[in-house]
């Protein structure tokens, strides 16, 4: 177990706060004219995603979090778990659907994902920034829609629903931003 003094705080440092792994987003060291120096720290809880702010006095220590981020390829899933494989040693890691959360709509076979482990237990699955998926269904367009914005709803192969321009057809591959769920372009 490694302990960090407030002088060692830096952006991206992974710590334990309230028995939950966190990553420091920003920190500000303040040395007042009178009194003890302190550090104001903003951090994000990795599991819940909440952003918190806390002030630490000089002399305070925080425990480091045993966090590993590994790049794995998604292979398959059963009723309970989604399985990711390390391509170097062919080890599989089972991840429960509740851990994947809303990112489940961006999970597709043979694509690489970042799996975050805390004490060798998966706590987060992060998809790539953008992925290419095939359109399997498009909502019908009404001919009398005069105030249309030039978009229609398309369902992709993973089941996610994405707004796409009118010129996109059924069966096309499109590129989607997984952070926002927005159509980027046709796949090349």
From Swiss-Prot:
GO terms for molecular function: translation elongation factor activity. InterPro entries: Elong-fact-P_C, NA-bd_OB-fold, Rib_uL2_dom2, Transl_elong_fac_P/YeiP, Transl_elong_KOW-like, Transl_elong_P/YeiP_cen, Transl_elong_P/YeiP_CS, Transl_elongation_fac_P. Transmembrane segments: none annotated. Gene3D superfamilies: 2.30.30.30, Nucleic acid-binding proteins (2.40.50.140). Keywords: Cytoplasm, Elongation factor, Hydroxylation, Protein biosynthesis. Belongs to the elongation factor P family. Involved in peptide bond synthesis. Alleviates ribosome stalling that occurs when 3 or more consecutive Pro residues or the sequence PPG is present in a protein, possibly by augmenting the peptidyl transferase activity of the ribosome. Modification of Lys-34 is required for alleviation. This is Elongation factor P. It comes from Blochmanniella pennsylvanica (strain BPEN). The lineage of its organism: Bacteria, Pseudomonadati, Pseudomonadota, Gammaproteobacteria, Enterobacterales. The gene is efp.
